[in-house]
A protein has these predicted regions:
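Small-residue helix/turn framework positions
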Residues: 2-193
Length: 193
């Protein structure tokens, strides 16, 4: 269509890994607020490099700053762009999945509190393998489908969302090993990061 630029199977190195993308940029409906559609696959990228290089990640996924390891991701995204070519977060919608063979997260207040309550310092540093998290972005929030982690002998099932307002709203189902406090604990709520 007139006013639309399309790209197909564009490949590049990005974020310490590789990326391939197809999509379009269009001013056909509104020259002041161009429409961006993007389907991307990212492989072997660095959490910290992505955080350092993308403002949208710093705003929507501040947890990346405290995350080590590499990830792969599939993303299907649509948004309007502002006059400065930034995403218009009110129109941003996406579906995707992020996968990591080895992820490390530390210095998260909620996990520090959980470690103190359960007297298990292993919970202060999350190290998980074979993580697969499906997510959607709507209304300024990234919502994740329930996913499982095993940390310090404790099984966690997490689901919830993080927002542009720097809040995190997650529910955690914690299964403790036999011999500790034992049993299952469910906790949740909204906190500022």
């Amino acid at each position: 269509a007139k006013g639309t630029v399309s790209m197909n199977r564009l490949a590049m190195n990005a974020f310490g890994g590789r990326m391939s993308a197809s999509g379009s940029y269009s001013t056909a409906a509104d020259a002041q607020r161009p429409a961006l559609k993007l389907k991307a696959e990212i492989a072997d990228a660095s959490f910290s490099t992505t955080f350092d290089q993308l403002d949208v990640v710093r705003r929507m996924v501040p947890l990346f700053e405290k995350t080590g390891g590499d990830y792969s991701m599939s993303l299907d995204l649509a948004t309007r762009l502002t006059q400065t070519m930034d995403p218009d977060y009110a129109t941003l919608q996406a579906d995707g999945a992020i996968r990591s063979k080895n992820i490390r997260v530390q210095n998260i207040a909620v996990f520090d509190q959980l470690a103190a309550a359960l007297k298990n310092d292993a919970l202060r540093r999350i190290e998980a393998k074979d993580v697969d998290i499906r997510f959607t972005i709507r209304d300024g929030r990234i919502a994740t489908q329930p996913f499982d982690l095993s940390v310090g002998g404790i099984s966690l099932n997490l689901s919830g969302s993080t927002g542009l307002d720097q809040t995190i709203d997650y529910t955690a189902r914690v299964t403790l090993p036999e011999g500790s406090a034992g049993g299952i604990l469910t906790a949740g709520g909204r906190r500022h990061l």
